[in-house]
Regions:
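Cytochrome P450 core scaffold surrounding the K-helix E-X-X-R motif
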Residues: 37-41
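Cysteine-cluster motifs in flexible loop/terminal segments that predominantly coordinate metals
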Residues: 35, 72-77, 86-139, 143, ...
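Glycine-rich beta-strand-centered segment in the early N-terminal region that forms part
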Residues: 17-32, 45-98, 142-144
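Conserved active-site and cofactor/substrate-binding residues in soluble primary-metabolism enzymes
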Residues: 52, 56, 125, 136, ...
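Short alpha-helical
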Residues: 34, 48, 92, 136, ...
């Protein structure tokens, strides 16, 4: 695993693969992205310290824990299948979870920010493997979607889809996207797929080419 050890300092640490317990899934990481949040953590501008970096990822099932036969959409999963996990947990007890707003669970970041030396160690995407917990959503990836596309599905893509869903966009709406960075490109593509007219603005001319 690649662990933060200080501001702009990382260390490769080696651990034995953890035992897969009931409800868990051990995944081998195929591809991981560098998110803007990872940069903030690297620069020491985030609450997470000394954790395993990375959260945007796609991987293949190595081992399924007892009771795991499908993903969270009900599709059958088996070793070797590609999957994409949600990087936060859902405690199922806080007000946000009880209201169905799992993305803002009070304890959602407990696992992601865990110290690298704490078992099960494989808690970030910048590692050979990743352990999905029993209360952590994951989804099987369709064969026709390449790794470099799906790796960002659990963060940037899903965040922009959620934002667009909140504004109740309809076909022929005019959408102005301020900023043509990663999130801006995601929101532009999603808006376009919904039939909206998309206008992108950015102070960096090269991003608009």
């Amino acid at each position: 695993v690649l662990s933060m050890t200080g501001i702009k300092k990382v260390e490769v640490k080696e651990f034995e693969l953890p035992e897969v317990e009931k409800g868990q899934v051990l995944m081998r990481v195929i591809k991981s992205n560098i998110c803007g949040s990872d940069v903030h953590m690297w620069e020491g501008k985030h609450i997470f310290k000394n954790h395993v970096l990375g959260h945007e990822m796609v991987g293949r099932v190595v081992k399924l824990g007892e009771g795991v036969v499908t993903d969270y959409a009900g599709r059958e999963v088996k070793p070797g299948d590609r999957i994409c996990p949600v990087y936060y947990l859902t405690c199922q007890k806080c007000k946000a979870c009880l209201d169905g707003n799992f993305n803002v669970c009070t304890h959602g970041s407990d696992y992601q920010g865990q110290h690298a030396d704490i078992y099960p160690h494989f808690t970030g995407a910048f590692a050979t493997h990743y352990m999905i917990q029993a209360n952590q959503y994951f989804y099987k990836v369709p064969d026709n979607i390449p790794d470099d596309v799906v790796a960002g599905a659990n963060c940037g893509i899903s965040q922009m889809y959620y934002a667009i869903d909140q504004i109740k966009m309809s076909a022929n709406d005019i959408v102005v996207v301020q900023g043509a960075g990663g999130l801006g490109l995601f929101s532009s593509a999603i808006s376009h797929s919904k039939g909206a007219r998309v206008i992108v603005i950015d102070s960096v001319a090269s991003r608009l080419e």
